[in-house]
């Protein structure tokens, strides 16, 4: 069984994807982490994430970089969004994701284009979203808990900028697959969102 989970930044898709993978006993890949590693590798080598050649060179990152705590920062998240617009970068990372999706044990992948590009044959495709203001508030609250001084307006502006890049790129834009199940987490608690996601997946599996 393959489950594809897509959605914009701070929609809650990562939390839901991990919970679904645990519930259904599937290997899990956070594909966004790969793009963050590319962005971080470019940063560490003083490259330009907006330059296709520098971004492509960033794909040659060591596996150890996937354990770098900096990958989870807002700054590196922004770099990931910037390198991901380059078709060369997406092509370089696609094979790793496709191979993971097609392993015999099944898989759950979370990203931006899993249901549309990486695993269009997935048994279940879930598109997780929430209003930009709600996503910005979540990110703001998270950063406040970690003692990071930031303005809500700046977080919201960054969310809008990332959405525009993700949805507007020519290659594999962020959008729900035609047969994706839509889940808006805007008014849901984490527990409520997890239960709703499990129910949606189980409902689709019963019909297939």
Feature locations, PLM:
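P-loop (Walker A) phosphate-binding loop of NTP-binding proteins
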Residues: 8
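Phosphate-binding beta-loop-alpha motif at adenosine-nucleotide cofactor sites
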Residues: 124, 174-190
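Hydrophobic anchor at the beta1->P-loop junction of P-loop NTPases
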Residues: 3-5
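Hydrophobic positions on the alpha1 helix immediately C-terminal to the Walker A/P-loop
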Residues: 16
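Conserved lysine of the Walker
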Residues: 13
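ATP-dependent small-molecule kinase phosphotransfer cores
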Residues: 33-106, 116, 133-137, 141-145, ...
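Post-Walker A helix-loop "phosphate-sensing" segment adjacent to the P-loop in P-loop NTPases
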Residues: 21-31
